[in-house]
């Protein structure tokens, strides 16, 4: 994999000269291999090593190179046609393949090739972009979107209309990450490389980006870009320094451990006790 990484890095430096008609066959083959590795989960844009998330930028570069290498093509749909550079992940699947991978895909869910979908995952009519990683046992509910290179953990529930932001550029930016056993409430948006740590519960209609204040009402601490593990988060406001107005914030109303979360329903966790 190291040799492939180096070749992708070299090709990316010369990306301005690359077009579908001028690309070297070896470069095309390397990019296709990298996309295939993302598609099968053999490689992923980000992975947790020794408790820290590490981003493999060369895989993002491979995705960006694919847009320069591959030309638009007609993609057949059930009742229409599409025209794009990226084929659909399930275009060549048959019943045996779906059963083997133990996934449910409800029409008209759209998943681009180069994204990984783990076993026992349910995709309602939703959208998963290339480079994304959706781990085992996760539910992607109706009209939820998983952006490019986003990382979704095991046993996550992305409720209806949830938006998980994607990131390809700038290259230095990390992907949005939802760790294992999280619940993201309907119409919430988690973007700009925010990390929602394991076992957290995000209420309906919570919007979190890198500049969003995430206020822990028990400790008074303010976090940016990270929801601590086991947090129960709702929408709220915090007063301005002058005291004349309030500005939006995400409020951590309580913390729960896995044992409590297993015994208590999501609705109970979201009931605020002042």
Curated annotation (Swiss-Prot):
* Quaternary assembly: Homotrimer.
What is this protein identified as?
Answer: 2,3,4,5-tetrahydropyridine-2,6-dicarboxylate N-succinyltransferase
Q: Show the CDD domains listed in the entry.
A: LbH_THP_succinylT
Pathway, per UniProt? Amino-acid biosynthesis; L-lysine biosynthesis via DAP pathway; LL-2,6-diaminopimelate from (S)-tetrahydrodipicolinate (succinylase route): step 1/3
Is Cell cycle set as a keyword in this record? no
Question: Sorted alphabetically, which Gene3D superfamilies does this protein's record hold?
Answer: Hexapeptide repeat proteins, Tetrahydrodipicolinate-N-succinyltransferase, N-terminal domain
Q: Which UniProt keywords apply?
A: Acyltransferase, Amino-acid biosynthesis, Cytoplasm, Diaminopimelate biosynthesis, Lysine biosynthesis, Repeat, Transferase
Annotated residues for binding of substrate: 104, 141
Q: What do the Gene Ontology cellular component annotations say?
A: cytoplasm
Main EC class of this protein? transferase
* Catalytic reaction list: (S)-2,3,4,5-tetrahydrodipicolinate + succinyl-CoA + H2O = (S)-2-succinylamino-6-oxoheptanedioate + CoA
Its EC number(s): 2.3.1.117
Q: Which PROSITE patterns does this chain map to?
A: HEXAPEP_TRANSFERASES
Subcellular location, principal: cytoplasm
Q: Where in the cell is it found?
A: Cytoplasm
> What GO MF terms are annotated?
2,3,4,5-tetrahydropyridine-2,6-dicarboxylate N-succinyltransferase activity; nucleotidyltransferase activity
InterPro entries linked to this entry: DapD_Trfase_Hexpep_rpt_fam, Hexapep, Hexapep_transf_CS, THP_succinylTrfase_dom1, THP_succinylTrfase_N_sf, Trimer_LpxA-like_sf
User: A Pfam family matched by this chain, by name?
Assistant: Hexapep_2
> Per UniProt, what is the name of the gene that codes for the protein in this document?
dapD
The entry's family comment says: Belongs to the transferase hexapeptide repeat family.
Q: What disulfide bonds does the UniProt entry report for this chain?
A: none
Superkingdom of origin organism: Bacteria
Write out the GO biological process terms: diaminopimelate biosynthetic process; lysine biosynthetic process via diaminopimelate
């Amino acid at each position: 994999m190291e040799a492939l990484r180096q070749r992708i890095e070299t090709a990316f430096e010369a990306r301005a000269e690359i077009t579908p008609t001028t690309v070297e066959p070896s470069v095309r083959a390397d990019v296709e291999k990298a996309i295939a590795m993302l598609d099968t989960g053999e490689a992923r844009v980000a992975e947790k090593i020794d408790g820290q998330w590490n981003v493999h930028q060369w895989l993002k570069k491979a995705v960006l190179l694919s847009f320069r290498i591959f030309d638009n093509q007609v993609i057949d749909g059930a009742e229409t046609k599409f025209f794009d550079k990226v084929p659909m992940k399930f275009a060549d699947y048959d019943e045996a393949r779906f059963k083997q991978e133990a996934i449910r895909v409800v029409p008209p869910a759209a998943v681009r090739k180069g994204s990984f979908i783990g076993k026992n995952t349910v995709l309602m009519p939703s959208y998963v972009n290339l480079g994304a990683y959706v781990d085992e046992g996760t539910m992607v509910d109706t009209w939820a979107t998983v952006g490019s290179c986003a990382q979704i953990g095991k046993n996550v529930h992305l409720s209806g209309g949830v938006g998980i932001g994607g990131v390809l550029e700038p290259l230095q930016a990390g992907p949005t990450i939802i760790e294992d056993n999280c619940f993201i409430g309907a119409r919430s948006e988690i973007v700009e490389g925010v990390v929602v740590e394991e076992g957290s519960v995000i209420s309906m209609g919570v919007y979190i980006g890198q500049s969003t204040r995430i206020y822990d009402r028990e400790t008074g601490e303010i976090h940016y870009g990270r929801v601590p593990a086991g947090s129960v988060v709702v929408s709220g406001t915090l007063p301005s320094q002058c005291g004349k107005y309030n500005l939006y914030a995400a409020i951590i109303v309580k913390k729960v451990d896995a044992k409590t979360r297993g015994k208590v329903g999501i609705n109970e966790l979201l009931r605020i006790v002042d």
